[in-house]
């Protein structure tokens, strides 16, 4: 499969495609899809024994502030296999900075055609409060034991900000 041939979404910025790299609650292994070879590589074994609280991936054909495709966490009832692509709807964004610069994480739920479980989730604040806290705690601490790496949480914004980040990253990719 060539991720570069997958559009960023079906109805941008409301309906996006996310290539999953790391399933929710998976062993603390950081996988990354190499954008040139479309191969799923082990990037590193995480030093902190923490699990991603939701499926982690990126929107194809986007370019975020850190020079990589825009990161997305997709909240689902079950872990999604690495390498698969899921249709999703953005509901918020966790703004953060790390050792590589700006590193926002869009928060999304499956498109309504995939699951009716999240039909009433319009904003990230509609998700369980504990899940929101777990996501923030994970990203605030997941690099703690890695030399030279750091993360600063800048705060949360809603679905409008997530859609704006998607639109910006699509435009940046197109140059």
From Swiss-Prot:
Cofactor(s) this protein cannot do without: Mg(2+)
GO biological process, one term: phosphate-containing compound metabolic process
Single Gene Ontology MF annotation: inorganic diphosphate phosphatase activity
Cellular location(s): Cytoplasm
Residues annotated for Mg(2+) 1 binding in this entry: 66, 71, 103
Predominant location: cytoplasm
UniProt binding sites for Mg(2+) 2: 71
Cross-referenced Gene3D superfamilies: Inorganic pyrophosphatase
Subunit structure: Homohexamer.
Family: Belongs to the PPase family.
Function: Catalyzes the hydrolysis of inorganic pyrophosphate (PPi) forming two phosphate ions.
Protein known as: Inorganic pyrophosphatase
Organism the protein comes from: Pseudomonas putida (strain ATCC 47054 / DSM 6125 / CFBP 8728 / NCIMB 11950 / KT2440)
Lineage, broadest ranks: Bacteria, Pseudomonadati, Pseudomonadota, Gammaproteobacteria, Pseudomonadales
Name of the coding gene: ppa
């Amino acid at each position: 499969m060539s991720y570069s041939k997958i559009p960023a979404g079906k109805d941008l910025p409301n309906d996006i495609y996310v290539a999953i790299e790391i399933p929710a609650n998976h062993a603390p292994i950081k996988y990354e899809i190499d954008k040139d070879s479309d191969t799923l590589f082990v990037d590193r074994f995480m030093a902190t024994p923490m699990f991603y609280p939701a499926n982690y991936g990126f929107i194809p054909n986007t370019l975020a502030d850190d020079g990589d495709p825009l990161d997305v966490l997709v909240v689902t009832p079950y872990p999604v296999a690495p390498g698969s692509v899921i249709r999703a709807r953005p509901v918020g964004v966790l703004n953060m900075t790390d050792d590589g610069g700006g590193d926002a994480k869009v928060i999304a739920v499956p498109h309504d055609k995939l699951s009716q479980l999240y039909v009433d989730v319009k904003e990230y604040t509609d998700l369980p409060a504990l899940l929101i806290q777990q996501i923030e705690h994970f990203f605030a601490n997941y690099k703690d034991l890695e030399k030279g790496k750091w993360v600063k949480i800048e705060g949360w914004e809603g679905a409008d900000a997530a859609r704006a980040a998607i639109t910006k990253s699509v435009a940046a990719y197109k140059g």
